[in-house]
Amino acid sequence: MSTNSPLSRARFHAATIVAVLTCSTGSLAARQVREDGLRVLDDTTIVQQVELLDGTKLFGRIARIDSTQILFRTVGGLEIGFQRRDVNQVRVVRGQRYRGEFWPADPSDSRLFLAPTARVPGQGHGYAGVYELVVPSFGVGIGKMGMISGGFSAIPGIDLEDQLFYIAPKLQLLSSEYVQGAVGLFWVKPGTSEESVGMVYTGITAGDFRASFSGGISFPFGSRSGFSEDPLLMLGGEVRTSKDVKFITENWIVPGEGTAILSFGFRRIDSRLTVEAAVATSTKGGGFLPLVNFSIAW
């Protein structure tokens, strides 16, 4: 396949990034399997995922194990016995029982499509992914209430010194079962330019794993121009339509100008992988812009 055109180069770069991320997170998963292993865990709140050699996935806990046999108790209370040699891997997953089955937690719930929510991934958790096929990104939990994320553009045809990179720390100030509040910074440096831009923000998220609302106010700034007189409002929401699909909307509003950028789409959820497909448009017209993101969590 030729990689001479910008689109082909973008696809080639994206495929390379996918391969690197998959290999990296695969090694993390392997370490997790060796750590958790085939054993009974003391913490009864932990959910284990057992994947058998035939591809079957079971969610629950290993209740008993010996040299050849495993007794597994599912989240629904069903006890299943199988041979130890039939197990492909075991790992700890986050989520909960709902409607009689296990719903994995959304590993990307610290953001909507691009905008942050007031949630944080937690110590030892994080993600790596790609926005719009050309912006590799990462996010890592720091302690129980902080995280730092960042990334850079890898747009084909643009010199390395002209690419963008960004960093976005976030601190959660309020954390309860149904409401979270946070403050943060989004800082962007356009390559070798001496000027940088960004915004500071504060926001809240209210709801649970089934549905939630996120809202915030941001104050844009430039390193030379200072803070803008017009703040930005972000209003968004998430609704879980099934155990592995979530509807998301993210909308940026400029009150002083009466304009808004609206977006909506879906996120496909696995215990580690999320894939997003959405469209964005402006109230001033200009058609629709497709959004495609994916990330792999640990």
Language-model regions, residue ranges each:
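Bacterial N-terminal signal peptides
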Residues: 14-25
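Compositionally biased alpha-helical segments
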Residues: 30-137
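Short, glycine/charged-rich beta-strand-loop motifs at protein surfaces that mediate ligand recognition
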Residues: 248-255, 263
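Structural signature of outer-membrane beta-barrel domains
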Residues: 155-157, 188-190, 220-222, 254-256, ...
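Feature captures outer-membrane beta-barrel proteins of Gram-negative bacteria and organelles
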Residues: 134-155, 163-176, 183, 198-215, ...
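Short, conserved beta-strand edge motifs with alternating hydrophobic and charged residues
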Residues: 213-218, 248-250
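Bacterial N-terminal signal peptides that target proteins for export
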Residues: 2-15
